[in-house]
Amino acid sequence: MIKAGIIGTGNIGTDLLLKLIKTDFIEPIIFAGRRMSSNGIKLAQEKGINVTDKGIQFFIDNKIYIDVIYDCTNATDAKKHAKIFKEQGVKVIDLTPAKIGDLCVPTINPEAIKTQDNVNMITCGGQASTPLLN
């Protein structure tokens, strides 16, 4: 089982959380945001997921064991986060426009997720339309 964290509790992070809950190979163990009053954190609590409003500070203060972090924040914060997670040995799947790691399109180069410390997912439009090219 892959142990995952999500940082960013807005629409993208929350949608991702709901998808991860349904998988049988990824266990979302922490959902990190900035406000306990956010709709995403409230929903995660209802689903029994551990939450925090400490954002990146939670990961700095708590060396919890996760295999991968999904960064659903913004490009500016993702650049700061990438350094912290690299020091901790945590793989990053970046869903922001930061373009820190190699671009990853699972239908084209799925091996990037296994071989790189940080991968940047292309836009949702790109992810959705790429299979049409095959």
State where each predicted segment sits.
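Beta-loop-alpha module in the N-terminal Rossmann-like domain of NAD(P)-dependent dehydrogenases
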Residues: 59-60, 64-85
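NAD(P)-binding Rossmann-fold cofactor-contacting core
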Residues: 23-47
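Rossmann-fold NAD(P)-binding glycine/threonine-rich loop
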Residues: 76-122
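Oxidoreductase and adenylate-handling cofactor-binding alpha/beta cores
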Residues: 128-134
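Short active-site oxyanion
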Residues: 2-3, 27-30, 66-69
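Short acidic-hydrophobic, aromatic-tinged amphipathic segments that line or gate anion-handling sites
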Residues: 50-58
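Glycine-rich adenosine-cofactor-binding loop
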Residues: 3-16
